[in-house]
């Protein structure tokens, strides 16, 4: 092969191929093709010079140092120009026109395009355009032939591209140094410029951020202030592919105003309803409010930069004006800094939502939240009550305008902020606070209180462990709360008070001594129960007896704290009944066996029992918590005593 100009190859390409021993990259081919396309543009020579010098330096300074070949920048360059293509076609809609023309004028080429891009036959023009744009966004290698056929790079694109690359080259160093969190889950060994322009971009976040940076005009507003406000608006607005064109026009209009007047002056003097159309209205109001309190800018930005908050800190203003105890909390420097410090300490931005040490196996934050009115937190999701599982749900709760936010606000005001100001460790403070209430558990349950459910949540960390996804079924009845192990319909389910009783007998030494030789477990289905079970030999016959405890009255309702009942029975091993008659026969057989055995083991309580339809023995009375503990103790210890006496005979 002749490596000379007559073959279309120059020394630069020869050096690249010879030095690396590899074929030209996708970007090198694209660059060569673009050089030819811009040859008739008035800036053709400037393009080539800047591409090989200033722009190359910019890509080099922003390359991904974590990639396999950090000495190469071809990937960064390809993604960058493809991202510009995406912005160009989303804004102008030219690709739609090309597709429509291709469909009408060149049907065979249109079918070839459908086949190449894997487009369904019935797809409309917008769906086709979206498919191609998505291919570009992921830097899926598109042959130059199709870039040409689809007119993806018309002259107008190159006009947009040269201005864009020049803007990024000019602003990149300053932009990279800005103390602004841009919504990333993980920040690798890369620059801000790389993360919003030189890798796969998202329609809802990095593409609008890139457009905001490209749109910046020097004048009345600094780059930092411009990108801070844009960051806050973009990260807190749900942006779809359909929304992006109008938002780009909104940014175009607003940046012109900000080049003539300071952005904060504009926000202070504007009606939030009349500016920044298309962005989240709640966030616009927040930006207008923050612009009035620039003296607190440093702590506010610190909070905005937390991954959990991501620019949205409206709850800070709400907290500083709330009166949970009737006393006004003023917006002042000390309060803003204290609340900011606590919020960042509690919500550190990890995937779990809240700081792990506050939500470990002690679940201190959750238990503390349940101590303040309205004695619950979270939100309703899919017919379940959700106590926040993961970052998104905690965010939703913290930013809610529902009354349940008062639990968090009150916890900060009454407990955490005072501790923070005194430099007391927040975890230790929560532990001491929760334990002070928890140690009064039994006494508190004796009081008449329609919100007594909270004490079970406060006292037992195990309640939170059981709800692995922090879901429960909770209607308006505070005495009917069913804990779920997962989100699905087939989830295990345990009634709250029944499960709390299980935890007492499973882990509390005072309760464990009452069930010596008895196993304790749960039945998390249907009418859930805590069961006690013992195997033994009595009068030379082997038995397995059980006591099922549940929180239901005789009408199968739960109306008060005193709704405990139990079944006492021998575990039988009947086959499935083949008829109603056989079912009744099995029940009668079981009943006679139960009466016969328990009359000998615990005769003193037999008057407290009645027959159930299935042959088991059921408590006649409904018990209080103390009452059920007492009768359980009498039954288990009575049975133990009878077995011991029988063994001695």
Model-predicted regions and their roles:
Residues 1-649:
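Flexible coil/loop and intrinsically disordered segments
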């Amino acid at each position: 092969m002749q490596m000379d100009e007559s073959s279309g190859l120059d020394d630069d390409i020869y050096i690249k191929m010879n030095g690396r021993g590899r074929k030209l990259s996708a970007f090198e081919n694209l660059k060569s093709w673009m050089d030819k396309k811009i040859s008739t543009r008035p800036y053709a020579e400037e393009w080539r010079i800047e591409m090989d010098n200033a722009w190359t330096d910019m890509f080099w300074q922003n390359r991904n140092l974590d990639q396999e070949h950090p000495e190469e920048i071809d990937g960064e360059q390809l993604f960058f120009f493809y991202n510009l293509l995406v912005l160009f076609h989303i804004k102008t809609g030219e690709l739609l026109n090309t597709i429509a023309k291709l469909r009408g004028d060149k049907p065979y080429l249109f079918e070839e395009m459908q086949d190449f891009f894997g487009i369904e036959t019935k797809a409309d023009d917008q769906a086709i355009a979206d498919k191609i744009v998505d291919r570009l966004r992921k830097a899926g290698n598109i042959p130059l032939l199709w870039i040409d056929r689809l007119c993806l790079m018309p002259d107008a694109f190159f006009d947009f591209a040269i201005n864009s690359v020049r803007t990024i080259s000019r602003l990149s160093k300053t932009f990279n140094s800005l103390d602004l969190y841009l919504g990333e889950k993980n920040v690798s060994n890369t620059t801000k410029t790389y993360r919003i322009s030189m890798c796969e971009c998202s329609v809802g976040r990095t593409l609008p951020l890139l457009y905001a940076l490209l749109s910046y005009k020097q004048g009345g507003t600094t780059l930092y202030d411009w990108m801070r406000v844009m960051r806050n608006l973009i990260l807190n607005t749900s942006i779809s592919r359909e929304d992006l064109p109008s938002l780009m026009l909104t940014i175009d209009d607003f940046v012109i105003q900000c080049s003539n007047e300071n952005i904060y002056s504009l926000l202070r003097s504007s009606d939030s309803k009349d500016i920044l159309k298309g962005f989240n209205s709640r966030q616009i109001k927040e930006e207008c409010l923050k612009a009035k309190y620039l003296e607190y800018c440093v702590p506010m930005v610190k909070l905005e930069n937390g991954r959990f908050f991501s620019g949205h800190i409206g709850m800070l203003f709400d907290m500083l004006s709330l009166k949970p105890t009737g006393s006004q909390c003023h917006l002042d420097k000390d309060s803003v800094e204290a609340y900011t410090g606590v919020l960042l300490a509690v919500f550190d931005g990890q995937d779990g939502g809240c700081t792990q040490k506050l939500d470990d196996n002690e679940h201190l934050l959750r238990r503390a939240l349940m101590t303040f009115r309205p004695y619950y937190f979270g939100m309703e999701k899919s017919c379940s009550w959700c106590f926040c599982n993961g970052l998104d749900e905690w965010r939703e709760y913290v930013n809610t305008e529902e009354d349940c936010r008062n639990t968090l606000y009150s916890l900060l005001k009454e407990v955490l902020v005072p501790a923070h100001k005194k430099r007391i460790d927040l975890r230790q403070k929560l532990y001491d606070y929760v334990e002070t209430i928890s140690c009064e558990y039994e006494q508190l349950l004796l009081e008449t209180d329609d919100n007594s459910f909270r004490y079970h949540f406060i006292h037992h960390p195990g309640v939170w462990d059981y709800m692995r996804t922090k879901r429960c079924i909770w209607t308006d009845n505070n005495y009917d709360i069913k804990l779920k192990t997962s989100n699905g319909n087939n989830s295990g389910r345990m009634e709250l008070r029944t499960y709390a009783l299980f935890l007492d007998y499973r882990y509390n030494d005072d309760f464990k001594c009452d069930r010596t030789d008895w196993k304790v477990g749960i039945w998390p289905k249907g009418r859930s129960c805590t069961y006690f079970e013992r195997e033994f030999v009595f009068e030379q016959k082997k038995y397995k007896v059980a006591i099922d405890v549940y929180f239901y009255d005789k009408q199968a309702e739960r109306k008060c704290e005193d709704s405990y009942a139990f079944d006492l029975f021998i575990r039988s091993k009947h086959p499935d009944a083949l008829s109603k008659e056989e079912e009744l026969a099995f029940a009668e057989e079981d009943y006679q066996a139960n009466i016969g055995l328990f009359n000998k083991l615990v005769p003193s309580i037999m008057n407290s029992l009645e027959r159930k339809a299935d042959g088991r023995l059921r408590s006649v009375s409904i018990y209080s918590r103390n009452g059920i503990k007492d009768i359980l103790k009498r039954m288990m210890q009575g049975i133990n005593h009878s077995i011991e006496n029988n063994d001695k005979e």
